[in-house]
């Protein structure tokens, strides 16, 4: 639609704000071409998938601004600029030039602490734009006096260009309390899910998780723990 919208606010009474929305039709113009510059790492497909406007569409300022905001919301660009120019042969046809500035998307974190239960050490590596496809990878490891826990997760926000996110993770943990309480537990498993907007502001997030858990005990364990000793398979949906 060839419309533009704006609003004016008028503060008359201290406790009231009057908003005036102005919607007007402007001259018919079309988007002839979209150019993308500065994406040395990010695939152009990632950028164009987040645009609300495309070549051949009616030129709409509202959708243009929404497109720019979509790119900024990806959080993989340090700067997003644009300009609109007419074509050389027709003022009614526009060329959209988008210039992005990519920023470092990898993160390394480390943590250490101590308390009444002993010391804790953590380490993590995260990448928010793997292979330039806007895929997030996250791995972390945490170690304390009794427990070792590790997790690796992948998030693809537009799996197979379906507008649906693919979320997968693998994790494992071992808690050894044989010396103090007579038991040791280990848990290993994975989760697999998706997320998408079915209707306006209505999202579906199905997820399945399966874990194998093992409990070992010795003679110093409580009778309750001894009865629970063995292997278990848990599944959640």
Predicted regions located by residue number:
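Periplasmic POTRA and POTRA-like interaction domains that precede
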Residues: 4-61, 87-122, 162-164
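Sec-exported extracytoplasmic/periplasmic mature domains
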Residues: 1, 52, 72-76
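Gram-negative/organellar outer-membrane beta-barrel architecture
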Residues: 60-237
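Phosphate-interacting basic helix/loop segments used at nucleotide- and nucleic-acid interfaces
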Residues: 1-6, 80
């Amino acid at each position: 639609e060839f419309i533009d919208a704006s609003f004016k606010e008028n503060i008359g009474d201290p406790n009231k704000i009057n908003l005036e929305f102005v919607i007007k039709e402007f001259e018919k113009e079309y988007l002839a071409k979209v150019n993308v510059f500065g994406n040395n790492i990010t695939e152009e497909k990632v950028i164009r998938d987040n645009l609300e406007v495309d070549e051949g569409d009616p030129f709409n300022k509202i959708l243009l601004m929404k497109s720019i905001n979509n790119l900024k919301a990806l959080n993989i660009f340090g700067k997003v600029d644009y300009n609109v120019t007419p074509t050389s042969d027709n003022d009614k046809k526009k060329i959209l030039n988008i210039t992005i500035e990519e920023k470092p998307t990898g993160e390394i974190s480390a943590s250490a602490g101590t308390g009444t239960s002993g010391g804790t050490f953590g380490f993590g590596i995260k990448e928010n734009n793997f292979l330039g496809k806007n895929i997030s990878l996250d791995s972390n490891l945490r170690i304390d006096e009794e427990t070792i826990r590790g997790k690796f997760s992948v998030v693809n926000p537009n799996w197979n260009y379906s507008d649906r996110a693919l979320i997968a993770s693998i994790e494992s943990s071992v808690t050894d309390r044989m010396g103090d309480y007579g038991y040791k537990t280990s848990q290993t498993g994975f989760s697999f899910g998706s997320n998408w907007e079915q209707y306006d502001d209505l999202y579906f997030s199905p997820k399945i998780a399966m874990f194998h858990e093992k409990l070992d005990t010795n003679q110093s364990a409580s009778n309750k723990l001894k009865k629970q000793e063995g292997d278990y398979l848990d599944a959640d949906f």
